[in-house]
Amino acid sequence: IKGVRYTPEMFLKRMAKSKRLENIKVRHMNTLYSLCWIFQLRIAIRVTKKTTRYAGYYAGFDEIAMTPGKLAMLPSWELSDVPAQCVLQDKLTEDQALERTWEYNKTGVQRKFRIMSAPPVLEEHVTERMYKPLYLFEFHNTELDEKKYKVLDSLTGDLEDISIT
């Protein structure tokens, strides 16, 4: 995925501004890639017994957070070669991700189209596999001589602890 909101340079710049963290040295170690399933959904909405309307939706499933969501538009992307050890292993199959994404988005469709005579039906879908960058940082406390490792999510800005063995 291209054009992500949070980058290592921005994070390092923010950390350098903080006066409370003067004794903590931060460095960007590596970039990891996590799978995001992107689905283009074609949904059949029965308005009456004889009339069916169709709607198109973009939906996604983030494997690192294991959460489905609705997308306003397709994200931009660009092909790039990355080492295999930097790509995190897939947790779900396409069918499992589609099922969870559809269950999440079906309630939103039902709320939006209250005039339905039957629940919405997923007719077709197109699947895209995109990988979002995750940035691995090392935090070194010079006073305690202690190192910790954290991962920065490029889309949400979440910083999570990890243990490296």
What is each of the regions a protein language model found here?
Residues 142-165:
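Acidic, serine/threonine-rich low-complexity disordered tracts
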